[in-house]
């Protein structure tokens, strides 16, 4: 018999038996929210409360996970454990027996997941209240809708509120008849303490006609954010398409030339920055580079910058229904709200547009890892500390797309796909892989290779990385941490995508350092301005020369923006006096050896034959021309 406190809307849903049992046969009060205001009140534990501790009983003791503070401009979620403030790249485990290259629950923990799955359901049934959040993964306005649901214990309502800000949600009164979720996220924070040694663990269970995600921690990154990404990747793997890990921006110059750039790469690779306005000094100049040894500064005078029309921040849906006859890749956004990292905003005036949007929003926002005084304004440059004097490197705000200026709500045809990598300082005394110039032009075969290897790069702020600054791979597509299946399947999908969009071109952009020069993201912004001023004109072979390291493709012979030539050493790192050929070649070998090691895993019978030829070319130290010849487009 169904219990009391069950809203009628649950009877309209077609739910899996286990979820139906939780909702209809437990004593928990079931809440299907109607408004954002209701979700915020739930997160605060009451309409008039200004603070709310998120606590659970674990083995007879109260364990506090974090605190929610109500400010004038939104709510601030702060977790007590610094390890819960950013994503652990090893959080995903697979519970099912479908093909996967990810660690399974049995492999990692030595136990089957099914008993823990049943314990999770029993624990959820024992809660005083459960918040059920129906939502669509995909893009509602474009008609790409995959029904999903989250089931969240009442005292973790901050998670439900944040998820609704990231993915959108279907109000209780708008849930359609026969709503049948293709994926369900179950949230049970106590299990990280009772079963998983306090670690971030998200278990994925792919069933015949749906996917279950068990989030055993409250940090949004691996579940409410990337968990939904994994849902789209799993569906795309079955249907033959990809959701790309990319920001996208339409750039319109003062001369009304247009260019649409999609920027891919590992976390910290410059995706959010690609949609940001260029940062200027007080006198209006752009600080492009600072010599890390001498302190000498290089400025660029850019009189009028382009107008930016953001399309995507992190997840670009390349669904088959969007593609057209342009021979360019066509994408739309897969997110309702953007999970913006603001660690670079450390004082007032750093990024006025974002600061204004956060300090005076049109509706309350959700912040993470920020200092918060109840009833005051949360200031996005005031980050909490992981330890005394050590600011948290991952302060975040969830910014609904509708609150962004100049947002593009439809599709975008991609002129240029860029790929970002964080690079370290590189000198004769300390040779490293910071040998990439301000931008490189990649033939499509090399563009595919970079997406297979996806180096995570130097000083990544977004994730927990115990390995320091050793080079690591984010994995195929740079979205591999969120995928559940086989790497080779994603590699084949990416190659198919490149071959089917021959009019989209490819570049490589480093950030942080170019040789001895500290650049941050300035090189990315200046490259964007330069390419947009070209109006999408293709590079001719005579304007390019082979990079000294062949996997870096081509370098432009010269770059001039608004009449100012760019220092040639920022284009060809080996000619920097502090670097030279010898240090460059040491860095090139480090980079090439890393690529060769990472590419071995793709050499399987399932790999597309052309893909095998491209990988063989890397293994055999092919020339740039040989890479071009494999897919002869530029």
Regions found by a protein language model. Name each.
Residues 2-65, 340-634:
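Conserved NTP phosphate-binding and transfer environment spanning the P-loop NTPase/kinase superfamily
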Residues 2-221:
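Long, basic/Gly/Ser/Thr-rich N-terminal segments
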Residues 140, 221, 269-272, 282-284, ...:
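Flexible loop/turn segments at secondary-structure boundaries
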Residues 143-148, 275-276, 321-325, 344, ...:
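Short acidic, glycine/serine/threonine-rich loops at helix termini
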Residues 221-254:
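N-terminal pre-Walker A segment at the start of P-loop NTPase domains
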Residues 256-286:
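Glycine-rich phosphate-binding P-loop
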Residues 260-262, 325-339, 521-532:
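Conserved, well-ordered active-site substructure
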Residues 287-288, 292-382:
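Conserved nucleotide-sensing/catalytic segment adjacent to the nucleotide-binding pocket
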